[in-house]
Amino acid sequence: VRLPSPDTACTPADLRGFFYDLYEDAPKPLRLLSAARPYVCPYDRIVPFVPQGARVLDVGCGTGALLALLVAIERIAEGVGCDVSAPALSFARGAAGRLAGGERLRFDHIETIDGVVDAPFDVVVMVDVLHHVPEAERQKVVAAAARRTAPGGVFIYKDMTDEPGGRRLAHTIDDLIFSHELVRQVSPEAVEHWAAGEGLELVASEYLPRLVYGHVLRVFRKPADGPNAGADA
């Protein structure tokens, strides 16, 4: 596996070879998509919000790319990923087995958000997940992520833009092709409102255009003495 260095900037050039090698047991189309994903997903803007030595929960981890990257660059002490897709988790576990430190990663199959491990984490991450969740369930998912964020910890939320225009259309077409879903994008203002209701404070907000896509990034912090200090979901 071509490993990125701990001081990598996590740019596409840094990561494409790493992700291609990481999924060597996957079908060729998945390997190519994994190698191309750094050109679309702004890993370079997500990673800096993960503190050194953190315990990380990735809700909707898919094939485990983000957690694998965080271990490879020696960023985290432990990572737990969960997803509804058993095949994706199989690739995630295979990828972890190719990494030094991969034993610090665990991947759990869940049926619903209620199945997510009930423990506090320094960082909870949710990347390109919420738009796949039925609209009536989205607030519950954000609340569950917030409750699993340790006091003083951060909740990192990244999803696609809901602003009308070509970038939203590009992502809608992308999901039709690859996920066979006609999705309804998530309002970042709604996420901010739900997170605030769980006692989280917004500390960073970015709009990130990449290729034909548009991303919204929101980072929230749970006050050290804030509400919902335990993971009681």
Stretches found by the model and what they are:
Residues 157-198, 204-212:
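C-terminal alpha-helical "lid/dimerization" subdomain adjacent to the S-adenosyl-L-methionine
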Residues 21-40:
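Class I SAM-dependent methyltransferase Rossmann-like catalytic core
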Residues 65, 69-113:
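Class I SAM-dependent methyltransferase SAM/SAH-binding core
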Residues 54-62:
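Conserved class I S-adenosyl-L-methionine
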Residues 139-151:
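A short glycine-rich, Lys/Arg-flanked "PGG" loop and its adjoining helix->strand segment in the class I
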Residues 36-52:
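Conserved alpha-helix/loop element of class I SAM-dependent methyltransferases that forms part
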Residues 1-27:
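N-terminal, positively charged/glycine-rich alpha-helical extensions of SAM-dependent methyltransferases
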Residues 125:
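A conserved beta-strand element that flanks and buttresses the S-adenosyl-L-methionine
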